[in-house]
Amino acid sequence: MHRGSLSRGHTSAVLAAVVAALAALAALLVATTPAQAAGSGALRGAGSNRCLDVLGGSQDDGALLQLYDCWGGTNQQWTSTDTGRLTVYGDKCLDVPGHATAPGTRVQIWSCSGGANQQWRVNSDGTVVGVESGLCLEAAGAGTANGTAVQLWTCNGGGNQKWTGLTGTPPTDGTCALPSTYRWSSTGVLAQPKSGWVALKDFTTVTHNGRHLVYGSTSSGSSYGSMVFSPFTNWSDMASAGQNAMNQAAVAPTLFYFAPKNIWVLAYQWGSWPFIYRTSSDPTDPNGWSAPQPLFTGSISGSDTGPIDQTLIADGQNMYLFFAGDNGKIYRASMPIGNFPGNFGSSYTTIMSDTKANLFEGVQVYKVQGQNQYLMIVEAMGANGRYFRSFTASSLSGSWTPQAASEGNPFAGKANSGATWTNDISHGDLVRDNPDQTMTVDPCNLQFLYQGKSPNAGGDYNSLPWRPGVLTLRR
């Protein structure tokens, strides 16, 4: 995160094994044109054994959805496309009216527009989740009778939120490769800063007790602070989650659970040392962290900011510190994992060099689940705002190969984010189900919590109105 004046900037075949499994379902009619979709057929409620049905067989925009006996009609034949849509009649999409994100919103069909309110994630656990709202498709009131309304509701694992008949997001072996070209859907602004703050930014996120736990930086326009959101279940809940200030700033934080020592670690910048860490047994308590300790004490040349935007990750032997300098370089330090938490000292290796714009800040490093691969993303400055470039490596101590590394083909940016409220895709964190030091992400279900701002916002960097949003990978 930069403190100065610069702006911060399928076609795919149906899987044979899944087709065979779906054919075994008596009520499921497999589509005859699978090349156009990830999966097709009736969508049957697990709790009711009845199908998702367009009321009265209507093909009009605004027709509502209900449960009804499965009978094989065209108004019960759904296609899950590679662009994240659920279509019926070929050209109508499952749609959330008016981009609503409130539990209890009744869903409808509408002419396909590509909007985020028509994007759905069909998960392997049977849930169907609205990308824009983060809410689950469900039979209202756990009803099972013909005519039961179908609506959005907070995901709770109930049988009325489980559906069978379409391929889930992960393939049958549970692993995916990283795409060479990324395409995302974006939420709108997920939260506004509470009174006294002009920005919410620099997010780090983990899953804790089944809920999202998000720390970030705040700006008042003249100074920086730190905060944590009260844990929440769905991204649509972020707007109403409590915003809790920390009594000691931890700017541009990294949060994770260090399993070898059974302790939570919060690393950050700007204090008595370039990088600092604190520990806790309860990461939800913003003021329950230990006294600050040095994480890194070195300095770098050719940088107006000094070391900035650290991130931490471990393999089986070592703990690694990666950081930037707003100067076209990425740096790395390491220590034996048995010595952590501790001080990396002042030594480091420069592992990447390019222009300042191409390697600016916001570096993050992750282990790719199911692959012998690590993913690095670095924030860059482009003609159309901030964006992220990606690199891959087979080891944390090795060299990094550009992957999606241009403004026209970025990891995430204006060119592929799907966001309409921001051009900038800036400092954030990939969502991890496993909060530990391996920083493992699931390439089948990538989500990216980022900061964006209105394209019309300008002026001093410290006063820019950064807000949170989430990208969801479209496969």
From Swiss-Prot:
The principal location of this protein is secreted
Q: Does the keyword Signal apply?
A: yes
Give the range the annotation lists for the signal sequence.
1-37
Q: List the SUPFAM superfamilies.
A: Arabinanase/levansucrase/invertase, Ricin B-like lectins
One Pfam family named in its UniProt record: Glyco_hydro_62
Q: Give the catalytic activity.
A: Hydrolysis of terminal non-reducing alpha-L-arabinofuranoside residues in alpha-L-arabinosides
Q: Which GO terms describe its biological process?
A: L-arabinose metabolic process; xylan catabolic process
From what superkingdom does this record's organism come?
Bacteria
Named in its record, the pathway it takes part in is: Glycan degradation; xylan degradation
GO MF, any single term: carbohydrate binding
- Provide this UniProt record's keywords sorted from A to Z: Carbohydrate metabolism, Glycosidase, Hydrolase, Lectin, Polysaccharide degradation, Secreted, Signal, Xylan degradation
Q: Which stretches make up the Ricin B-type lectin domain? A: 39-166
Q: Which GO terms describe its cellular component?
A: extracellular region
Task: Give the E.C. number(s).
Answer: 3.2.1.55
Q: Where in the cell is it found?
A: Secreted
Keyword Hydrolase recorded: yes
| Enzyme class, broadest EC rank | hydrolase
Q: Give the family from UniProt.
A: Belongs to the glycosyl hydr olase 62 family.
Q: What does this protein do?
A: Involved in the degradation of xylan and is a key enzyme in the complete degradation of the plant cell wall. It has a specific arabinofuranose-debranching activity on xylan from gramineae. Acts synergistically with the xylanases and binds specifically to xylan. From small arabinoxylo-oligosides (ranging from arabinoxylotriose to arabinoxylohexaose), it liberates arabinose and, after prolonged incubation, the purified enzyme exhibits some xylanolytic activity as well.
- Write down what this protein is called: Extracellular exo-alpha-L-arabinofuranosidase
The species is Streptomyces coelicolor (strain ATCC BAA-471 / A3(2) / M145)
